[in-house]
């Protein structure tokens, strides 16, 4: 309800972003398929995703670190591989551009979730797992706020190890409803003032005195 952190130039950067040029640079041989980014932990459903991509024109962009290691481990036992490539490390703006350029984003943790929400593209969130499975309730609450269609809710549950069924297919009808959901969530966030603006207003309206911290 308090909004999310948003840079003052975020929307301008999005509007000026050359999506076609980015896609040509990072997936120059992409057929008329989906460009998918992968930033995850080690989901048990990863082999499912990779198998689903085999034989399709879709291309998977894998971020470095744990995602790349997980993909390489899964591919070691697969006789046929999907189209994929590894991305180098990048800074925040580069990560944002990847989210804007891709047709579907797999993101992990809270920071990348916020960036995925601002991107307005379909995404599947890998929430940080907790030993007592408290993250399950948090994920369900988020999916309720997102007003996710059944197929997208199932995708999140399977990706986060809450259900064992297969991942929903990346068919056009599924991606279409997921895109509508992501855009609706973005519209709701844009209708709010950014978090910093709301915090400043709260401080001013309640006459809260803020004392600058002293260096130690």
Q: Which residues fall in each region the model found?
A:
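Short, hydrophobic beta-strand segments that form beta-sheet elements in well-ordered domains
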Residues: 36-39, 59-64, 104-107
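Catalytic donor nucleotide-activated moiety binding site of glycosyltransferases and closely related
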Residues: 55-88
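A donor-sugar binding/catalytic signature common to diverse glycosyltransferases
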Residues: 91-138
């Amino acid at each position: 309800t308090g909004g999310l952190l948003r840079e003052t130039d975020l929307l301008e950067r999005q509007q000026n972003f050359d999506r076609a040029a980015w896609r040509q640079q990072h997936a120059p041989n992409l057929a008329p398929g989906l460009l998918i980014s992968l930033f995850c932990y080690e989901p048990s459903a990863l082999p499912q995703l990779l198998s689903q991509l085999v034989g399709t024109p879709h291309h998977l962009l894998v971020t470095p670190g744990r995602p790349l290691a997980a993909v390489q481990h899964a591919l070691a036992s697969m006789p046929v591989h999907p189209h994929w490539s590894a991305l180098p490390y990048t800074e925040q703006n580069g990560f944002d551009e990847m989210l804007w350029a891709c047709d579907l984003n797999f993101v992990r943790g809270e920071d990348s979730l916020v960036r995925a929400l601002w991107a307005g593209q379909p995404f599947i969130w890998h929430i940080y797992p907790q030993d007592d499975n408290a993250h399950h309730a948090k994920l369900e609450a988020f999916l309720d706020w997102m007003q996710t269609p059944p197929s997208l809710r199932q995708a999140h549950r399977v990706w986060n190890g809450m259900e064992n069924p297969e991942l929903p297919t990346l068919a056009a009808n599924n991606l279409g409803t997921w895109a509508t959901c992501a855009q609706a969530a973005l519209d709701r966030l844009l209708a709010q003032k950014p978090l910093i603006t709301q915090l400043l207003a709260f401080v001013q309206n309640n006459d809260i005195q803020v004392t600058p911290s002293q260096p130690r």
